[in-house]
Amino acid sequence: MLDKLVAQYSAIIESLGEDVNREGLRDTPKRAAKAMQFLCRGYNQSLEEVTNGAVFESDTDEMVLVKDIELYSLCEHHLLPFIGRCHIAYIPNGKVLGLSKFARIVDMFARRMQIQENLTRQIAEAVLEVTNAHGVGVIIEARHMCMMMRGVEKQNSVMSSSVMLGSMRNNPSTRSEFLTLVHSRRAL
């Protein structure tokens, strides 16, 4: 696959009128191909692999929230990055997930070409699948380079998307607690 990507990046560079053999660009097709493989490595990962059995029995039945998980993804429309933060909460149902696994789930889905709305849903559904939680809430806030570097060129826009499942969707007080906790900004 790497050789095919290298050839395609060479063709793109030449199509833009550049000399792919000039000093500054000579290794660019290979570097760009490797970068794209890294940025899309989520296609080669599975939920079972990234969670690695880190689900533990627990009597905890109150909300668990992990805030400000940084994420980097590629918009499927322009192949430009969007960069942001993900907040995940769940109401355990006899099981809790190892803390680092939330970041791994976010990365697995973020390292694919897609739109933010789908990314938000994929993360929520994965957490629900792994934990069998009573409820799951996910909010992503991100800046999209496709809107900042091209098109309307708006530098300060932030897109927010949310998915609420189970009690996070059906119980207004649970949903409100999640939103309040996400929006509280207390320095540690």
UniProtKB/Swiss-Prot annotation:
Q: What GO CC terms are in its UniProt record?
A: cytoplasm
Which positions make up the signal peptide?
Answer: none
UniProt cross-references to Pfam families, sorted A to Z = GTP_cyclohydroI
What is its EC class?
A: hydrolase
User: Known catalysed reaction(s)?
Assistant: GTP + H2O = 7,8-dihydroneopterin 3'-triphosphate + formate + H(+)
Annotated GO biological processes are: one-carbon metabolic process; tetrahydrobiopterin biosynthetic process; tetrahydrofolate biosynthetic process
* Keywords for the protein's UniProt record, in alphabetical order: GTP-binding, Hydrolase, Metal-binding, Nucleotide-binding, One-carbon metabolism, Zinc
EC no. given is 3.5.4.16
Q: Which InterPro entries match?
A: GTP-CH-I_C/QueF, GTP-CH-I_N, GTP_CycHdrlase_I, GTP_CycHdrlase_I_CS, GTP_CycHdrlase_I_dom
Q: What residues does Zn(2+) bind to?
A: C75, H78, C146
Gene Ontology MF annotations: GTP binding; GTP cyclohydrolase I activity; zinc ion binding
The metabolic or biological pathway listed in the UniProt record of this protein is:
Cofactor biosynthesis; 7,8-dihydroneopterin triphosphate biosynthesis; 7,8-dihydroneopterin triphosphate from GTP: step 1/1
The record describes its quaternary structure and partners as: Toroid-shaped homodecamer, composed of two pentamers of five dimers.
NCBIfam families xref list: folE, PRK09347.1-2, PRK09347.1-3
Family named by the database record: Belongs to the GTP cyclohydrolase I family.
What name has this protein been given in UniProt?
GTP cyclohydrolase 1
Q: Which gene encodes it?
A: folE
